Amino acid sequence: MRDQGRLDHFLVFCHRTSILNQWKSAAARLGLRLEEWPCPPEQSQDADGLLVTYQGAGRQREALGERLKQWSLSACMAIADEAHHLGVDPDEPDATAWGQTFLELTGSVRLRLGLTGTPFRADNLAFCAARRMRVRLDDSGWVEQIRPDLCVEPRDLIAAGDVRPLEFRFQDGWVEHSREGHPDRDVSPLSAEQRESWRARNLRRAIRLADSSSIGQQVLLRAQQKLNQLRERQPQAAGLVIARDISHAEAISRVLMDDGNRVELIHSQSPQATERLNAFQSGEADWLVSIDMCAEGFDAPRLRVVAYLTTVVTRSRFVQGITRAVRMTPELAAREAIPREASYVFAPADPLLMEYARSWSVAEPYVLRPQEQEAEDEQPGVGAWRGPSLPLEAVEDGAGAVIRLKTPELPAFLQR
């Protein structure tokens, strides 16, 4: 459209400054010059477009609006990167500042393009420039969905060689729940537990680092073994551990360092966290241990192994975490055939995580759900006890079992 003379300028919104730099570099490879806003008028005068964070646009809405008046907006494209950050409640369209700012600044442009690989973060929130359509689901009645104009599924990218496939190794075992002073014990199978409150309790116990036979320790051990194998072919390969909280991340880091690994521990309270994340991308550390710093926008193609040891089990967070290990570079692509060599995910055999693993490479429609949903009542006494607990231990040899999944194509029996 630029070559055809239908577009003159581009206005790109991002949620992080680091992603602005990625857009600037990508545009330069296409012969386009994008300047970060705010900038002096003479610097942006001959630019092909502007880059701005959502927060920056909100703070300087008036000034940016005046600058845009110098453009012919009928020949301008506005791009919302990670558009799920612009979620607007249809019943309260003024409630979300970023979405409202985007609407006001781009109301007169020729095209608005929203890009996202992440489901919207809350029920009933829709990207403010997206199409909403009512769809009938068999006998379940009508639902409302966000309908994208173009959907590129991860499995399509895998087939094209643009990203790596993932293979999953889920550590199974029996989880024992005992109370101090009580001779009786409750034993629950990690991968087969159907009661939600017990499933959640099992996962909390499974990620603990008790002793060498614990499920969490086995996940770390097998992840290290796989990374060592991968480093024989790719010496710069690294691993990522996603922990539950800061103290948990520190404990994991100690285990990895005791095993002789070079570890970079980075979390939201770490000094110079962004700079250290950037340094890790081309650094020498074997492992990056983090909590929530390595989601969207973090790009480290040398990551080949992910150990998922957190109690966050939403599909969006799981997929965000594991897809840090699918990135490719032109240099890597030149050395590998298609499909690319797989990366690996290690995690406790939680039923929800295994369900997500079976479908991560397929895009799911985003459904706008009713605003109010009745929570299921828990059975009295189930999952409510928070007293002293014993270290997690393997019951018989259950902790030695590993459930293996490959994607995107799965055996029929795993798709039931």
Question: What kind of feature is each model-predicted range?
Answer:
Residues 6-29, 244-247:
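Conserved Walker A/P-loop ATP-binding site and its immediately adjacent core
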